[in-house]
C-alpha cells in the first residue's frame, strides 16, 4: 500500500510539484483530499505518514530558508520509495501535551549550528527521515513565545545517524499499522525554520493541515462504515425480511447517512477554501481558520459513534477480529486525540471566531452561499437557521464561552454542513 500511496498516487507529492498522474501542474487540495477520502477506506494507518510528509513539506516551503528547501524538496516529493524522505512532527512532551508552552526541549546555537536536547513523548512515524520539532531557543522566554521551529534530519550530511534515539514504541489502542514512539534528543543537529520568535505560529500551519487530514480520515472511515452497513442490511435476513426493509433499520441507516454526508460536505468545502486561502483570498483564510477546528472537533467525534453503529449492525460477527469492525472502531478514537483533544479544539474554534470580527465574517459568508444558491422551499428555513445559531453563538461567547465552546462548535458545524450540502454541485477543473 505504501507503493500505491506514495508512488502510484503521489498523495504526499501532488500539492508540491507537477507530474503526479502526468499533470503539468500541482493538483488542488480537493483532489488530494478526495483521493485520501477514498484511500482511507482501505487503509487508515498509512494516512498518518502521508499527512506528516505532505504537511511538513508545506510548512518547510512556506517558512524555511530557500537553501534548506532546495536541499530536501526533491526527496520529500519523490514518487520513488527508495529516494523518498518521509516526514514527522515531534512536539508532545510528557508534561506538555495540549499545553505546548510548557515544552522543555531546548536548542543551543554553537558556532552557527543548532543542537536540540530533550525528550519528546508521543511521536508518530518516529523513524521518519525529517521531523519538525518545537524547542526552546531562549530559556529566559517562557510559554510559546520562547519556542522556535526546527527541521531535524535522521541522518547527517556525512551519512551518520543524528544524535537522537527512539526510547520505545507505544502499545496503542488503534493506529497499529504505523509506529508511534518516544524520542530522546541528545544534542541532535537541526536546521532552524523561519523566524525563531514565530516558531509556534509556524508550527500551527503544520498542525492545522494535520487537523484537516484527521477530519478527512474520519469522514472516509464513516463512509466505509456506512457502505458496510448498507451491504449487510441488503443481504442479511431476519424475521423473513431483509434488514433494509425494517423501519428501525432504515431510521438508523438514515442517521448514519446524514452524519457521513455532513462530514463529507465539510471536508470538501474546506479543501476548496484552502485553495482560495493559499491564493491570497482573505475571506477564505478567515473561514478556513474556523472550519478546520470545526471539522477536527465534530467529525472526529462522530466517527466513533458511526463505527460503533456499524459494528452493531453486523451483529456478533462485528465483534470478531476476523472482520474489519474492531479495527475501525479502535482507529476511530485516534482523531479526537491527535493534534488537540475535543476541549482544546473547541476553544480554538472560539479563538478563531473572536479574532478580527470573524463571527460576522462567517455569518455573511453563509448568507451569501444561501442567497447565491437557486431559491427553493428551504431557502427561508436556512436563513432563519443562520440567524438562530448566530444569536446563540453571540450570547454564549459574551457570557462564558469556556463552558459552552463545545455546543458552539457543534452548532456551527452542523449549520455549515447543512448549507454546504444545499449548494449546487460544482465541477473541479484540473
Predicted regions, residues:
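A glycine-rich, basic-preceded beta-loop-alpha segment at the flavin cofactor/substrate interface
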Residues: 158-163, 167, 179-210, 227-244, ...
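Extended, domain-scale alpha-helical bundle/helix-rich regions
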Residues: 26-31, 37-52, 56
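Alpha-helix capping/hinge segments and adjacent helical runs
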Residues: 289-366
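A short core secondary-structure module
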Residues: 113, 117-161
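C-terminal helix-coil-helix/basic helical segment that borders enzyme active sites and/or dimer interfaces
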Residues: 261-296, 312, 394-403
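Long, amphipathic alpha-helical stalk/connector segments used for oligomerization, subunit docking
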Residues: 353, 362-400, 404
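Extended, charge-enriched "interface" segments that sit outside catalytic cores
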Residues: 1-25
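Single conserved hydrophobic/aromatic residue that forms the stacking wall/gate
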Residues: 419-430
Amino acid at each position: 500500500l505504501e507503493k500505491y500511496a506514495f508512488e502510484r498516487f503521489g498523495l504526499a507529492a501532488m500539492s508540491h510539484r507537477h507530474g503526479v498522474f502526468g499533470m503539468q501542474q500541482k493538483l488542488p487540495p480537493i483532489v488530494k483530499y478526495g483521493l485520501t477520502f477514498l484511500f482511507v477506506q482501505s487503509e487508515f494507518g498509512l494516512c498518518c505518514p502521508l499527512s506528516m510528509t505532505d504537511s511538513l513539506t508545506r510548512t518547510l516551503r512556506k517558512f524555511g530558508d530557500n537553501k534548506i528547501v532546495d536541499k530536501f524538496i526533491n526527496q520529500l516529493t519523490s514518487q520513488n520509495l527508495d529516494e523518498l524522505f518521509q516526514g514527522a512532527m515531534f512536539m508532545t512532551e510528557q508534561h506538555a501535551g495540549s499545553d505546548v508552552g510548557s515544552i522543555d526541549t531546548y536548542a543551543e546555537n554553537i558556532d552557527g549550528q543548532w543542537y536540540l536536547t530533550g525528550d519528546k513523548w508521543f511521536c508518530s512515524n518516529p523513524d521518519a527521515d525529517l521531523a519538525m520539532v518545537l524547542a526552546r531557543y531562549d530559556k529566559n522566554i517562557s510559554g510559546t513565545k520562547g519556542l522556535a521551529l526546527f527541521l531535524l534530519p535522521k541522518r547527517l550530511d556525512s551519512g551518520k545517524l543524528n544524535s537522537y534515539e527512539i526510547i520505545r514504541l507505544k502499545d496503542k489502542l488503534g493506529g497499529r499499522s504505523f509506529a508511534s514512539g518516544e524520542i530522546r534528543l541528545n544534542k541532535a543537529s537541526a536546521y532552524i525554520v523561519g523566524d525563531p520568535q514565530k516558531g509556534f505560529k509556524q508550527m500551527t500551519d503544520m498542525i492545522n493541515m494535520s487537523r484537516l487530514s484527521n477530519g478527512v480520515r474520519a469522514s472516509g472511515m464513516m463512509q466505509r462504515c456506512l457502505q458496510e452497513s448498507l451491504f449487510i442490511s441488503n443481504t442479511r435476513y431476519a424475521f423473513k425480511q431483509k434488514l433494509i426493509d425494517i423501519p428501525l433499520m432504515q431510521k438508523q441507516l438514515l442517521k448514519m447517512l446524514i452524519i457521513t454526508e455532513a462530514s463529507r460536505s465539510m471536508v470538501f468545502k474546506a479543501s476548496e477554501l484552502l485553495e482560495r486561502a493559499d491564493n491570497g483570498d482573505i475571506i477564505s483564510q478567515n473561514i478556513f481558520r474556523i472550519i478546520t477546528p470545526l471539522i477536527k472537533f465534530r467529525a472526529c467525534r462522530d466517527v466513533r459513534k458511526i463505527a460503533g453503529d456499524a459494528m452493531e449492525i453486523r451483529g456478533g460477527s462485528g465483534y470478531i477480529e476476523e472482520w474489519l469492525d474492531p479495527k475501525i472502531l479502535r482507529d476511530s478514537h485516534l482523531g479526537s486525540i491527535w493534534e488537540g483533544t475535543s476541549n482544546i479544539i473547541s476553544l480554538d474554534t472560539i479563538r478563531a471566531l473572536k479574532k478580527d470580527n470573524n463571527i460576522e465574517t462567517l455569518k455573511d459568508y453563509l448568507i451569501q452561499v444561501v442567497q447565491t444558491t437557486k431559491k427553493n422551499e428551504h431557502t427561508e428555513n436556512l436563513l432563519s437557521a443562520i440567524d438562530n445559531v448566530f444569536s446563540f453563538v453571540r450570547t454564549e461567547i459574551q457570557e462564558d464561552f469556556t463552558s459552552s465552546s463545545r455546543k458552539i462548535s457543534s452548532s456551527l458545524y452542523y449549520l455549515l454542513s447543512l448549507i454546504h450540502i444545499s449548494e449546487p454541485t460544482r465541477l473541479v477543473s484540473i
